[in-house]
Curated annotation (Swiss-Prot):
Annotated protein name in UniProt: Large ribosomal subunit protein uL1
Transmembrane residue ranges: none
Coiled-coil ranges per UniProt: none
GO CC annotation terms, alphabetical: cytosolic large ribosomal subunit
Keyword terms of this UniProt record: Repressor, Ribonucleoprotein, Ribosomal protein, RNA-binding, rRNA-binding, Translation regulation, tRNA-binding
NCBIfam families on file: rplA_bact
Length: 230
């Protein structure tokens, strides 16, 4: 065990916390220092120049990463009639209406993404205390409340990620797995940065992308030079 600890410390020592790395080098370091026995997630942490106390500066949205996340998501859809059939055809894992709501109330939460048609929100709204704390509440801002549930299901299955600034104006988002090639991680990160740039609040002043760093689940954070992300 001591030898493992020494090996991990040696790998993490390769990361200079005060250095800003070119994106390709940063991601290569993340891959190299991902030492867990499982395929670690690679996450981006992006500090935005916003005032998180102001509701008009909340940055929130969703995008389909070019290379996905490396995780197959289970999708639940609250819909009925033709929309329910479309959701099933698109690959939804669980589809229902009042019956699904009752299952969720009873503790059934065997899904990673919840999608709802607008008319289903009268039912889903009552599940806020169950779905909300788990980040599963459908929301039109991220495309999970929509009449086009088939597209929403396909996006979720294709590797869609949701992003939202926290109280400190920071976005945390998975951009892949340690097993991904560097180029795939780079393209996923660039897509996330592009989406954040497009979502910049009009009232945000000064430097918007203040700091970008990447890390694996168990690894050290690596600062990224965002000038070569475009």
């Amino acid at each position: 065990m001591a030898n493992v600890s020494k090996r991990i410390k040696a790998l993490r020592a390769k990361v200079d916390r005060n250095k800003v790395y070119p994106v390709t080098e940063a991601l290569a370091l993340v891959k190299e220092t991902a030492t867990a026995k499982f395929d670690e997630s690679v996450d981006a942490v992006i500090n935005l120049g916003i005032d998180a106390r102001k509701s008009d500066q909340l940055v929130r949205g969703a995008l389909v990463l070019p290379h996905g996340t490396g995780k197959t998501k289970r999708v639940a859809v609250f819909a009925q009639g033709a929309a329910a059939e479309a959701a099933k055809a698109a690959g939804a894992d669980i589809v229902g209406f009042e019956d699904l709501a009752e299952q969720v109330k009873g503790g059934m939460l065997d899904f990673d993404v919840a999608i709802a048609t607008p008319d289903a929100m009268r039912i889903v709204g009552a599940l806020g205390q169950v779905l909300g704390p788990r980040g599963l509440m459908p929301n039109p801002k991220v495309g999970t409340v929509t009449p086009d549930v088939a597209t929403a299901v396909k996006n979720a299955k294709a590797g869609q990620v949701q992003y939202r600034t926290d109280k400190g104006g920071i976005v945390h988002c998975t951009i892949g797995r340690a097993s991904f090639e560097v180029d795939a991680l780079k393209e996923n990160l660039a897509a996330l940065v592009d989406a954040l740039n497009k979502a910049k609040p009009a009232s945000s002043k000064g430097v918007y992308l203040k700091k970008v760093s990447v890390s694996s689940t168990m690894g050290a954070g690596v600062r990224v030079d965002q000038s070569n992300l475009a």
